[in-house]
Amino acid sequence: MMVKELEEVVVRFSGDSGDGMQLAGNIFSNVSATVGNDICTFPDYPADIRAPQGSLTGVSGFQVHIGAGQVYTPGDRCHVLVAMNPSALKTQIKFCKPQGLIITDSDSFEARDLEKAQFKTDNPFEELGIKQEVLEVPISSMCKESLKDSELD
């Protein structure tokens, strides 16, 4: 993967409500601001108080617009969409630019997860007609592995 330096970028984190999307977005935003970037954020909470895990109505999001210069809005469509599960991908893809990058937690794209998101096939990217670059990363496994020697799980 090629590294590109950009004047500005919009990143949208999305996943189940309660899974830490606001926390992840806030940490990412704070780090970005600490290294000298200007930021503007927008948390996106679902209407459901506590929707069933993996459901379409329970997707929570956090968008951050990062810029080398002044940033005045959280941005319209994102350059990077982080989708922690199929429901997040399905409900949030509309916010991703056509030339954007989609990062998914491949650990959360099993048959039962796709069923909860009401996909009809086992290929959500094809079913949604996704043309953006997709980076499938085993995020959950990586987190568990990094915590294996701690008392956290």
What are the language-model segments listed below?
Residues M1-D153:
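Active-site cofactor/cluster-binding pocket
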